[in-house]
């Protein structure tokens, strides 16, 4: 990162991570003001699909690494760390908001499972796992979630996203 310095231009670096290797690179990321987007789908029960390469669950390691970053670098954590969660059959919009807001005082980005490129023999499994963000938001509203303001704000973003994708052929979609 230090090699890319041009007078008059400020570079901002963004990194998406599952936080498994966070302790190894933590000081470097903080020193270089790298913005982090940490992938976590909620509580340990919600995070069931995020496993390490050998198939073991990763939640306890991820949670400990995030807490370590927050405890050791609170200002960096407040300004540079955000969360992305993927909605599926083991979580809900309300559960995700509740968990991340309670534990990290952050409002997460929430994405649906990507519908593109599903192998024909995996479609049934995908359909079982897929949960609509719009339906999950409605469920949170109907249940009187304590995070209605955040969820409603996110709902407006979802509506804008649908509009943009419907009316403009070339859109760039991220989290």
Task: For every predicted segment, state its role.
Residues 1-31, 35-36, 40-46, 53-61, ...:
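Canonical radical SAM enzyme core domain
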Residues 48-175:
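Radical SAM enzyme [4Fe-4S]-AdoMet core and its adjacent flexible, acidic
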């Amino acid at each position: 990162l230090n090699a890319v310095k041009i007078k008059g231009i400020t570079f901002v670096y963004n990194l998406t991570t599952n936080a498994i290797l966070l302790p190894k690179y933590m000081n470097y990321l903080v020193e270089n003001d790298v913005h982090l987007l940490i992938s976590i789908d909620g509580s340990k029960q919600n995070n069931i699909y995020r496993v390490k390469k050998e198939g073991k669950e990763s939640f306890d390691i991820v949670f400990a690494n995030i807490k370590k970053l927050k405890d050791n670098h609170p200002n960096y954590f407040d300004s540079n760390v955000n969360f992305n969660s993927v909605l599926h059959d083991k979580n809900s919009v309300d559960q995700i908001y509740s968990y991340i807001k309670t534990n990290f005082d952050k409002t997460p980005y929430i994405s649906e499972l990507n519908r593109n490129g599903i192998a024909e023999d995996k479609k049934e499994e995908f359909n079982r796992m897929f949960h609509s963000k719009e339906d999950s938001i409605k469920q949170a509203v109907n249940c009187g979630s304590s995070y209605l303001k955040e969820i409603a704000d996110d709902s407006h973003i979802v509506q804008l996203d649908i509009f943009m994708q419907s009316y403009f052929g070339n859109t760039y979609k991220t989290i």
